Amino acid sequence: QFDAAALKAATPLGKGLGASPGAACGKVVFTAEDAEEWNARGEKVVLVRLETSPEDITGMKASQGILTVRGGMTSHAAVVARGMGTCCVSGCGDIAMDEENKKFTLAGKEFHEGDYISIDGTTGNIYDGAIKTVDATIAGEFGRVMAWADKYRTLKVRTNADTPADAKKARELGAEGIGLCRTEHMFFEEDRIAAFREMICSDTVEEREAALEKILPYQQGDFEALYEALEGNPVTIRFLDPPLHEFVPTEEADIEKLANAQGKSVETIKNIIASLHEFNPMMGHRGCRLAVTYPEIAKMQTKAVIRAAINVQKKHADWTVKPEIMIPLVCEVKELKFVKKVVVETADAEIAAAGVNLEYEVGTMIEIPRAALTADEIATEADFFCFGTNDLTQMTFGFSRDDAGKFLNAYYDTKIFENDPFAKLDQNGVGKLMETAIKLGKPVNPKLHVGICGEHGGDPSSVEFCHKIGLDYVSCSPFRVPIARLAAAQAAISNK
């Protein structure tokens, strides 16, 4: 947090959305690579981007704070920053960005690479220069209040975590499992992105499988580390979700490197990259649609999940390691049936080959309205439902979470909306779809367990709604776990 006296003396230059709380001060950098490089030599940096994407992960980790021109409360930058406990201000549309020349203008002032800037992830305020920061503290009463909360709540609280470090932090803050592990973030590490790009640019199934075989040990290692961190608590692993264009290189040097590795011309690689372009990627070739087109991806991920679980279970006989495999973006039961068949055949073969007993579950995310409306059909094939309320909100409202920031302020000013539907669950519309899905799904499959893993899982009023409609758990960013625990207790008491 900022030093109170220093903050009082400062005047904000501009304002975005307070997307991830905290305070950050550092030198401006414009690329993830620069953030890593500067951080490695001991510089504190603030990463400034038009918007972030999964390939920026390593640079985001190296930054004190993140500032984006585009995006709302559930944009990539906001969600990832909250998960890492990194300060983030998103959607500051007043910034005029000049990425090519590594500079931007805000309130008439020009900022260049290396200039100091301070951002407040709670208020969304942006300041010129360096403001002194002090470490945030947790008072001794925290543990006592949390113990009271745990005594009364009936909702379980899990976390959204992709790394053992995030999982460990969430466990310290009281999380009872992982409700969402986004496997795509694991592909961006330096040693595996090359193999994944090789897979994308392959011409045949055999070539794709050979590239995926290189990634398998890395992915398996990631899952083993997560299972170790969770000590037998549940881990829900979402299979590959983003469209493939997010993984391909954009820099000329990286394209040449990929062409050389593939033994293809730069022109051919550029054509492959161009072919991945989509007009609306959010509703394009992503989620389970990737697993239908390329079942070999789902096979590789299943092998990694199951092998990791078997290894960790063998090491810790007193733990119950029961993988939960989550298929994203399902809108039709036959889709789930198709992907589930691939998963089950692969998993059962792995378990048989190892000569062990291992239980696992296959469930789905409910993030498309049609999935909620046909939940009675989908429940016949799913062991669990998890509401991905970030996508369910944008699909229900029909506006993109990354573009909504441009007009939502006008909606608040004119009182069309009272709240940001991406931050506070829309109970009348999105909530009604959730209720419908539960009412349709549970009678068909009484063992169905249901959770939520959108950012709403850390919002108190949304948590109360989840309690009311009978969810089993909420899952949120690690640093929001205490809020969810408290909100779940308040919901239990007020709804007695």
Predicted regions and their residues:
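Acidic, glycine-rich flexible loop/linker segments
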Residues: 1-35, 39-44, 49-176, 180-181, ...
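Conserved alpha/beta-domain cores
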Residues: 138, 148-496
